Amino acid sequence: MFKFLKQVSDYAKETFQSAKYIGQGLSVTFDHMSRRPVTVQYPYEKLIPSERFRGRIHFEYDKCIACEVCVRVCPINLPVVDWEFNKETKKKKLKHYSIDFGVCIFCGNCVEYCPSNCLSMTEEYELAAYDRHELNYDNVALGRLPYKVTNDPMVTPMRELAYLPKGVIDPHTVPHTSRRAGLRPEEILEQIEAEKTAAEKTAAEITDK
């Protein structure tokens, strides 16, 4: 009889322990169900890169003096600078410039140390290609300006991944329909236009007086 009661007691303890573990797992699941989504629906939604984002390098052919500083400061000696010496002007003349983004680590040293500021970082990060040779950009491809996320009518730009409004810490109390943090690009433009109009109106009133 005592053995039977012990078996029943052990079974009850194991059942309670199992139910406890299942309850803990379900509590985490239900907890995440009540939170707001943090997923960006790419490519229909895209984040607006920060001002210091290190994306594809932009190259201005007319500014380059073929000094090859970018090659010397590059950790992997990546930029290919092809030039010839002009005997009349006694200066280097750039013939061809290329960067292989399949190898580039986007450290930004070439941009930082360029004496003529012919290199700059852009916000372009969509560089995927089926052939690795297509990632080798020449001076023509490097000179192309990227298409900004804020100018793409087919994409909803998102300023940040922080969906919570200012001053709210607990995400569980925020409904999924509430406004995201930060202003949208069109709202920023409207705000700038409103400030500009107000300034012009104030200047006109001062002039009339």
From Swiss-Prot:
Chloroplast listed as a keyword: no
GO MF annotation list: 4 iron, 4 sulfur cluster binding; iron ion binding; NADH dehydrogenase (ubiquinone) activity; quinone binding
Residue intervals of the 4Fe-4S ferredoxin-type domain: 55-84, 95-124
Cofactor: [4Fe-4S] cluster
Residues at which [4Fe-4S] cluster 1 binds: C64, C67, C70, C114
Binding site for [4Fe-4S] cluster 2: C74, C104, C107, C110
A GO BP annotation: photosynthesis, light reaction
InterPro entries per UniProt: 4Fe4S_Fe-S-bd, 4Fe4S_Fe_S_CS, NADH_quinone_OxRdtase_chainI, NDHI
Domain of life: Bacteria
Locations listed in the record: Cellular thylakoid membrane
Catalysed reactions, as listed in the record: a plastoquinone + NADH + (n+1) H(+)(in) = a plastoquinol + NAD(+) + n H(+)(out); a plastoquinone + NADPH + (n+1) H(+)(in) = a plastoquinol + NADP(+) + n H(+)(out)
Top enzyme category: translocase
Membrane-related topology note: Peripheral membrane protein
GO CC terms: plasma membrane-derived thylakoid membrane
EC number: 7.1.1.-
Function: NDH-1 shuttles electrons from an unknown electron donor, via FMN and iron-sulfur (Fe-S) centers, to quinones in the respiratory and/or the photosynthetic chain. The immediate electron acceptor for the enzyme in this species is believed to be plastoquinone. Couples the redox reaction to proton translocation, and thus conserves the redox energy in a proton gradient.
Family: Belongs to the complex I 23 kDa subunit family.
Record note on quaternary structure: NDH-1 is composed of at least 11 different subunits.
Name under which the protein is recorded: NAD(P)H-quinone oxidoreductase subunit I
Organism per entry: Trichodesmium erythraeum (strain IMS101)
Lineage: Bacteria, Bacillati, Cyanobacteriota, Cyanophyceae, Oscillatoriophycideae
